[in-house]
Swiss-Prot record:
Subunit structure, interactors included: Monomer.
Record motif 'KMSKS' region, residues: 268-272
The protein's Enzyme Commission number: 6.1.1.18
Native source species: Escherichia coli O157:H7
Motif segment ('HIGH' region): 34-44
Compartmental location: Cytoplasm
Pfam families: tRNA-synt_1c, tRNA-synt_1c_C, tRNA-synt_1c_C2
GO cellular component terms attached to this protein's record: cytosol
Family the UniProt entry places it in: Belongs to the class-I aminoacyl-tRNA synthetase family.
Gene responsible for this protein: glnS
Keywords on record: Aminoacyl-tRNA synthetase, ATP-binding, Cytoplasm, Ligase, Nucleotide-binding, Protein biosynthesis
Protein name: Glutamine--tRNA ligase
Gene Ontology BP term (one): glutaminyl-tRNA aminoacylation
Residues involved in ATP binding: 35-37, 41-47, 231, 261-262, 269-271
Length: 554
């Protein structure tokens, strides 16, 4: 398959192909412009993959530009986190990291140009009055009483704003467009507002800050962006994007194109709602493995490749739709099934004693991957006392149950065939120990007499077991569309985190944070980057071996 054939196809790439073929553009230049006021989530990953992927495929450029026009909500912590997320996803920006604040001097000059052209004015209505004067979708707005100030007066008042002569909220600069426009965004939008706050890049140089709609288009033009890609909620804003560039002296006029944002089942993407989850301590932070943030997904064990594959599969369209969580989970499941080494861990342990086993123990050889001999093998200790999962034993069972049953046989993974002989229980009737015998001539082979043993269970040698905490993460919400609930917090899944104390094979003591394993017959897990210690490793479940929610949704 050629490089061109391997590329995804969508309406944006078709536009780019036409622009290059017609000579409108000779190269492609995109940008990813996050606001540094929070952590990126899976929805941002779609935009990252789109913008950086296009630049990569067309051998163009993609800028990372921070839209840092509101110093009150922004922080260098978010800047660093976003840069880390972009790089972790496998992308590299062109040149240095850029900031909208790099252009504050030029933006100020363009604002003065609009004033000189009679296309901007200083308004002293309160923010509440501005909203009232703006009108509604069915009623036109009305002009501010300050709309017809002279150019000279507006220049003087704008300078007064810049030098701190007004209190916050007492004045703003507005574009003079059309208060009767059917598009509310064109009803004299605010271009500059006053904020007495220190900026993480410019310090206290400015007390007036440009609005997103004024900054965004000019920054694109100054950087030579050819295709400015936004989500659909900015569709109406394109009119203002074009109006600003049409009315200032700037040689480049990029075009904005909109695509559908990513909506994912069983989670929320709203920054306000995500913040509420964190501040009200429903989760332990922005990187909680149940969160849809990139840092949360990474901590849970999602790989960059699986997220890129997910973004590729869902595609780029103009129609809003909601993607099934199973689609994202399928991507990581396929990735880890192919690439994760296998290991054994017992999540709900019960002791099993092999009464006729002689000696201190032995080492058994296990493949690190059943289908990839190139991944090698490991030596796992075996002894006469082991841990098995409580769900792998029943005193009585029907024929469909293929695990250990009293009086019947089962195979221990890569080890021996055992037979359950009796059990020991505590005062409450709970099984504390299962007593078995083993067939010494069945190490990794069938019984010599030809009898069939169908079931296979995993195990961990008790003498060599590594005590581990296992965090069984699941979907954060119990309904597909929690955002539609009257109170989205009321539909949090009470079993989104279940903590178990178990045992793992000793090789896992060398696990490193983020390294994925398939715990055989259990699912895919990785060492937690926050809570693990050398004395007590903590493993997070990334995803189960199968979609356990499939039947729930039927």
């Amino acid at each position: 398959m050629s490089e061109a054939e391997a590329r995804p196809t969508n309406f944006i790439r078709q536009i780019i192909d036409e622009d290059l073929a017609s000579g409108k553009h000779t190269t492609v230049h995109t940008r990813f412009p996050p606001e540094p006021n929070g952590y990126l989530h899976i929805g941002h990953a779609k935009s990252i993959c789109l913008n950086f992927g296009i630049a990569q495929d067309y051998k163009g450029q993609c800028n990372l530009r921070f839209d840092d026009t509101n110093p009150v909500k922004e922080d260098i912590e978010y800047v660093d986190s976003i840069k880390n997320d972009v790089e972790w996803l496998g992308f590299h920006w062109s040149g240095n990291v850029r900031y909208s604040s790099d252009y504050f001097d030029q933006l100020h000059a363009y604002a003065i140009e609009l004033i000189n052209k009679g296309l901007a004015y200083v308004d002293e209505l309160t923010p509440e009055q501005i909203r009232e004067y703006r009108g509604t979708l069915t009623q036109p707005g009305k002009n501010s009483p300050y709309r017809d100030r002279s150019v000279e007066e507006n220049l003087a008042l704008f300078e007064k704003m810049r030098t701190g002569g007004f209190e916050e909220g007492k004045a703003c600069l507005r574009a003079k467009i059309d208060m009767a426009s059917p598009f509310i965004v064109m009803r004299d939008p605010v271009l500059y507002r006053i904020k007495f706050a220190e900026h993480h890049q410019t310090g206290n140089k400015w007390c007036i800050y440009p609005m997103y709609d004024f900054t965004h288009c000019i920054s694109d033009a100054l950087e030579g962006i050819t295709h400015s890609l936004c989500t659909l909620e900015f569709q109406d804003n394109r009119r203002l994007y074009d109006w600003v560039l049409d009315n200032i002296t700037i040689p480049v006029h990029p075009r904005q194109y909109e695509f559908s944002r990513l909506n994912l089942e069983y989670t929320v993407m709203s920054k306000r709602k995500l913040n509420l989850l964190v501040t009200d301590k429903h989760v332990e932070g922005w990187d909680d493995p149940r969160m849809p943030t990139i840092s949360g997904l990474r901590r849970r064990g999602y790989t960059a490749a699986s997220i890129r594959e997910f973004c590729k599969r869902i595609g780029v369209t103009k129609q809003d739709n909601t993607i099934e969580m199973a689609s994202l989970e399928s991507c990581i499941r396929e990735d880890l099934n192919e690439n994760a080494p296998r290991a054994m861990a017992v999540i709900d342990p019960v002791k099993l004693v092999i009464e006729n086993y002689q000696g201190e123990g032995e080492m058994v050889t296990m493949p690190n991957h059943p289908n990839k001999p190139e991944m090698g093998s490991r030596q796992v200790p075996f002894s006469g006392e082991i841990w098995i999962d409580r769900s792998d034993f029943r005193e009585e069972a029907n024929k469909q149950y293929k695990r250990l049953v009293l009086g019947k046989e089962v195979r221990l993974r890569n080890a021996y065939v055992i037979k359950a002989e009796r059990v020991e229980k505590d005062a409450e009737g709970n099984i504390t120990t299962i007593f078995c015998t083993y067939d010494a001539d069945t190490l990794s082979k069938d019984p010599a007499d030809g009898r069939k043993v169908k079931g296979v269970i995993h195990w961990v040698s008790a003498a060599h077991a590594l005590p581990v905490e296992i965090r069984l993460y699941d979907r954060l919400f119990s309904v597909p569309n929690p955002g539609a609930a009257d109170d989205f917090l009321s539909v949090i899944n009470p079993e989104s985190l279940v903590i178990k104390q178990g045992f793992a094979e000793p090789s896992l003591k060398d696990a490193v944070a983020g390294k994925a394993f398939q715990f055989e017959r259990e699912g895919y897990f990785c060492l937690d980057s926050r809570h693990s210690t050398a004395e007590k490793p903590v493993f997070n479940r990334t995803v189960g071996l199968r979609d356990t929610w499939a039947k729930v949704g039927e």
